[in-house]
């Protein structure tokens, strides 16, 4: 028999009754029932109940074991009586009667419990992550993550993609977030950078004649902490294709990701045909370029109903500024003053002056609008709004006014708030869509200049002619995102493979041809030697796994994450380097001045 086990703790069944077996694992729980000890023995695969009665030679050792000790148990498999069968355990029809128990490793008193799902301080959980990972839900999440990544690899291979790995040590790139820099010992004063994404390398692969590339790529960004992103590193399914238009990328990736979601959704419905929503439409309907389509609320413009109306706040805004619009947020079943007042109070808590509203109720046989706005604009305008929005008795509508560029994010948050408060969001489904036709440029308010809205290597719609336009902010890009339940899970574009177009695109944001050659020299040179039309995208693996397992945050699907201060509490990183290490790297730290 093997030194440690003949079976795993999930393997034994009724067919094994009468067998002599050996198990090893962690003591999950010990119970004393009338002098008989019951030990739940756990390993990576599952759990088996071990019985040690007072007549067993193993009983003396069994009395000493405690939770999370690692033990080896030899014994006989016996069937449980009908009244003790545990149908919640795969091994619940049998138990192991211990003949010998060997303690392989004792455990100190635990700094946090691993039994159940306690709400424990995050820093304690991260410092003792090796214990935290023993918890059933977290352990299953990590296993499921591995299964999802394996399925991605398999399905990408099935549709003709090949995995290639790109360098981890590379050059610093000026676009995007801050780089993590790695000092060079051989070249004092020079630094490598950890890649924010394999963007330039995968495009170079297409220029090199490869096609249908993918990899499970680690990406590193030195960003300030955000609730929706882990500090330090994250993983993406990165891919690129040659001789394609954006429809080709969509046609390849939509079935693949739908299959991944269907395989791991646990029976929840998954969108069959992903709608393709232009960016401008998404902003106006949902107040976001990553809308949660499980929320049925769609905003509409109702400016005409307030122009010249008795509600002077809106009427005066419209008259004085042609950019002003009034957006309506219809709220089915929200027609109570209490709910409307709660929404108004929430808006004020967000720094807004309030949230105007109308709600409708029947007075006898007549459907009337109620609230201050209804009184000010009159019955005819109120009914016109109701008709436009398709509202009925018991429904409400909220209004946001101003220049859309300044208020659309708040309007989107109000839409989300209303949908959640009214339980309109179906949480037992996955709604996926494409967001397309992103703006190529945007206005940088801080620096008072035009800047790239997203990926600077995207192909602008209209090509070189569009880049010579007087209205740069009107240019759209062949860029697209995939969104699921309000989360961006992928982003991509058709790339610009023309050196002339590349130079012009960067000139429009204030960078010269010399700047382009200096910062993106490898890609710029490659494009001068025959570059195929190409495009691709990258899926955020962490977010996809989080959605599929129903985790509340990204730490619940990551093995050894950092905390929100970008510290690895388990390994003690970041840490100070020794003077000898710094001398080797020709680095002298400059002490920071204290305020």
Curated annotation (Swiss-Prot):
It is found in: Cytoplasm. It catalyses: tRNA(Asx) + L-aspartate + ATP = L-aspartyl-tRNA(Asx) + AMP + diphosphate. L-aspartate binds at residues 175, 221, 454, 495. ATP binds at residues 221-223, 488, 540-543. It is an enzyme of class 6 (ligase). NCBIfam families: aspS_bact (TIGR00459), PRK00476.1 (NF001750). Homodimer. This is Aspartate--tRNA(Asp/Asn) ligase. The gene is aspS.
